[in-house]
Amino acid sequence: MAAHSFTLVPAAYVYLLRPAPGSPRDRDGAVSASTQVLLQLRRNTGYMDGHWACGASGHVEAAESVVETALRETREELGVSVSAAELSPLTAMHRTNDLGGAALEQRIDMFFTLRAWTGAPAVREPAKNAGLRWFSLVDLPAPVPPHA
């Protein structure tokens, strides 16, 4: 049995969702064809630049929970305030770069949705974010990261 050393990198992703303007409000958190998601156009990050990605995301910092990360990144990247009670867990994804025996970097990505916040989402890190835009969940732009 081969021994591997590895690093586990946890991250939080927060998708802001809203009904399309003029459409009825979704009931009980249901997602419909009129639901829109806020995406950011990545730039100058060294990873997936030129892709439309999650509105707010980032790595968990030392002594921080994934929920605390989600709240912090939403505030830092979009300038909106949210309470932990408003975050809805969506899914988790494990990713790895195992290339057959090398040291592994493993990632665990935790995804949340958010339907209520205080403030208007805005680009707060223009060096990394070329713009924000709402898209229909049934008509996403290209390209988007494969894991998002």
Language model features by range: what are they?
Residues 1-38, 55, 59-60, 113:
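Conserved N-terminal beta-strand and adjoining loop/helix that marks the start
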Residues 6-8, 102-108, 126-129:
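A generic structural micro-feature
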Residues 20-23, 35, 45-47, 61, ...:
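Short, charged/polar surface micro-motifs in flexible loops or helix N-caps
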Residues 31-77, 81:
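Conserved Nudix-box catalytic region and its N-terminal flanking loop in Nudix hydrolases
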Residues 39, 111-113, 132-134:
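Conserved hydrophobic/aromatic beta-strand scaffold that supports enzyme active sites
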Residues 81-91:
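A short coil-to-beta-strand element that immediately follows conserved catalytic motifs
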Residues 91-121:
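Active-site-adjacent beta-strand/loop module that shapes the phosphate/pyrophosphate-binding cleft
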Residues 119-148:
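Nudix hydrolase/Nudix homology domain
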